[in-house]
Amino acid sequence: MTAELNFLDLFLKASIVVQLVIVILISFSIISWAIIIQRSRILTNALKEARTFEDRFWSGEDLNKLYEGLSNRRDGLTGSEQIFCVGFKEFSRLKQVNPDAPEAIIKGTMRAMNLAMNREIESLENRVPFLATVASVSPYIGLFGTVWGIMHAFMALSGAKQATLQMVAPGIAEALIATAIGLFAAIPAVMAYNRLSLRVNAIEQDYGNFIDEFTTILHRQAFGKAPH
C-alpha cells in the first residue's frame, strides 16, 4: 500500500498550531519574494541612474546650468542627482553668507551631501532588513511547528493498545513539512539579503566617490584656484 504525499491534505489534518506555523511561513515567503523583486528593480535603476548622471557630470556641462536643469525638473530627484543639487545649493548659499571662510564652506557642503547620501541609502535599504529577519527566524518557527506536530502525533498514541508506524507516520509527515517550509522561506531570503546588501554597498561607494570628486571641484572654487 502506497500513500501519496498531498500537502493540502496534510495541512488540513494538522493541528491548529502547525497550521498557524505553516500559514506564517508561507506569508513570510510571499512577502520576501515581493521585496526581492521590488528592491532588485529599484537598485538596478539606482545604479544605472548614478552611472548616467556621472557621465553627464563629467561631460563638461556648466555646473550652474546642470543645477538649474535638475532643479526645474518636475519629477523627484534621487541618487547622485539629489546629492549634487543639495551640495551645489549649500555651497552657493554658504559662499554668499561667508565668502571669506572657504574651509567652513567646504565642511558645510560635505555635511549636507553626506546627509543627502544617507537619506538615499536609507531609502534604498527600505524593507531589505526584513529579509534578514525572515532568514533568521523562519527555521526556528518551522522547527517549533515540527516539535509541536511530533508531540501531537505521539500524544495520539497514548490511548492506542498497539502503536504502529502507520499510526504516527501522517502526524510526523505533517510536522516535518513545517521545517521544510521554514527552510523554503529562509534560504531565498538569506541569499537575497546578501545579494541586495552588496548592491547597496556598491551604490553607496559610487555616491561616496562622487561626493569626493565633486568636493575637489568645489574646493578649487572656494579657494579661488583654477583646475590644473
Curated annotation (Swiss-Prot):
The gene is tolQ. This is Tol-Pal system protein TolQ. Keywords: Cell cycle, Cell division, Cell inner membrane, Cell membrane, Membrane, Transmembrane, Transmembrane helix. Part of the Tol-Pal system, which plays a role in outer membrane invagination during cell division and is important for maintaining outer membrane integrity. It comes from the Bacteria. It is a multi-pass membrane protein. GO terms for cellular component: plasma membrane. HAMAP family: TolQ (MF_02202). The chain crosses the membrane at residues 16-36, 137-157, 172-192. Pfam families: MotA_ExbB (PF01618). The keyword Glycosyltransferase does not apply. It is found in: Cell inner membrane. InterPro entries: ExbB/TolQ_transport (IPR050790), MotA_ExbB_proton_chnl (IPR002898), Tol-Pal_TolQ (IPR014163). The lineage of its organism: Bacteria, Pseudomonadati, Pseudomonadota, Gammaproteobacteria, Pasteurellales. Belongs to the ExbB/TolQ family. One of its GO terms (biological process) is bacteriocin transport. The Tol-Pal system is composed of five core proteins: the inner membrane proteins TolA, TolQ and TolR, the periplasmic protein TolB and the outer membrane protein Pal. They form a network linking the inner and outer membranes and the peptidoglycan layer.
